[in-house]
Amino acid sequence: MTSGLKAPSARTRSAPMTDHDIYLFREGSHMRLYERLGAHLDAVEGVAGCRFAVWAPNAARASVIGDFNGWDPAPHALQARPDGSGIWEGFVPGAKHGQCYKYRIESRRHGAVLEKGDPFAFAWEEPPRTASRIWSLDHDWQDAEWMANRAKVNALDAPFSVYEMHLGSWMRPDGNPGGFLNYREMAVRLADYLVQTGFTHVELMPVTEHPFYGSWGYQTTGYFAPTARYGTPEDFMFFVDHLHQRGIGVILDWVPSHFPSDAHGLAQFDGTALYEHADPRQGFHPEWQSCIFNYGRNEVRGFLGSSALFWFDRYHVDGIRVDAVASMLYLDYGRKAGEWIPNEHGGHENLAAVSFLREVNSAVYREYPDVQ
């Protein structure tokens, strides 16, 4: 089989992932994969650029395409790790912060060629564009007082009044009803409103990147990036920081229950059902027309668990609300008789999902006992 890809000319190295990282990745217990996979600015032998790492075990070839190479797959082919983990890696000299990119994956399955966004991208283009962006997260946090005292604020016996909202439709720019406020503008206006009305916390409908605005964020493609509709990652960091300085906690809706089938997203990522179940009775939601995560696959558990911790680690959030839990817990959710597969005991409980939710809950409270 030939693809037209030339021998890799990108500077490559055996990756930042250690043998221990790979062990945890395979075990499903690596809860900070975002530090290892994805795009990270770096330097090799004194040459500045970006290292890339993507999980695509059923790829015959993989490369990174983007602004730095004219979207040509030839210059920057990735190399598969020799440990059989299915991770492909490479270093692109000269790649810079803010540049757009995708992974070009040639699948072993029927030779399909796919152009995919980065599952671990910290930033994306503003929809309807679909490329990931190289991004180095940086913010000078000013919420030390809140962080030091939030165990008291978030205690179960403390006053708790939550304002649930969708950022895009809460308030529009003056004179532009079809536009959006920036995260920074919303932070100031929202904090004033919440303080005046006596709320202790705000719960945001999903801010994770999503292609379809009409989904209100519940069809996520970017599990490690705030949507670019309202600004940059640093703008959203400012949003959280400002609310904390005004005494308001921030809770995020988080959607590990399903994901859309958009061509640039997680569905059929390497030409196979990688993040989802292959059997539609397990891997496709008939009501929502979306894909269901394979919670029994260790690498998928690590991906989702890393997403959950990421928002606490890098964005100082005070809690996550897991969306559509019932659809995760029950194999027959939204299905008629004969449209679902029982578990190993003949029941309708999704045992892998139950285990996954317990693991994520334990991981979050182990690392952050002071959150909701």
Segment roles from a protein language model:
Residues 62-64, 101:
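Short beta-strand elements bearing conserved aromatic residues within extracellular beta-rich modules
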Residues 146-157, 166-349:
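Substrate-binding/active-site clefts of carbohydrate-active enzymes
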Residues 73-85:
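Short, acidic Ser/Thr/Gly-rich low-complexity loop/linker segments typical of extracellular
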